[in-house]
Amino acid sequence: TAPAHLQEETMEGADLVADALGRINRILHRAMDGIPAETLNTQPAAEANSMSWLAWHLCRVQDRHISDLLELPQLWVADGWHAKFGMAKDEKETGTGHSPAQVEALRVDSADLPLGYADAVYERAKQYLATMKPADLDAAINEPQYDPLPTVGVRLVSIISDNIQHAGQVMYVRGLLERQGWLGV
């Protein structure tokens, strides 16, 4: 079917979020499909992140927050993605604060692994967003460490902000390593 903004219906906030997350998923595929593992795992500088690490981290952030909003276990554990990546069964592990050694330790044999995880978390996000009503975006999230409490809408914008930055970094690292110009999106 056509995207919501091309249909006769009014586009809602959740439709915008779904569109943004879909674009992020396509950026990852465009940047990583067919790229050799050596390139995916290369850190362009000693303390820089590899394409594989950036894609993994992007997915972890999206999986964690969407799963929290759904009040469901993260796909990271529920679908065994942690084992596929050879990592601990730890839902709090998203890569934030990783040392250069931890970044270097995350290795993939092909783009299939991070892209498979990206597709899985995006599908979950789409399913969640398809159930939303406009008022749902204004619902407060019970996270008392924040004042004011964040809303579902604020959390979704945070996911987009984080993910679009990291998707752009994946594209940038690919350009650095392959010494090619902008691929576009």
Language-model features: locations:
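Short, contiguous alpha-helical
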Residues: A18-H29, T39-G97, E123, A140-V185
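N-terminal leader segment of winged-helix/HTH proteins
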Residues: T10-A18
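Acidic/histidine-rich alpha-helical segments that form the ligand environment
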Residues: A88-A139, V157
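Short, Lys/Arg-enriched N-terminal segments with co-localized hydrophobic residues
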Residues: T1-T10
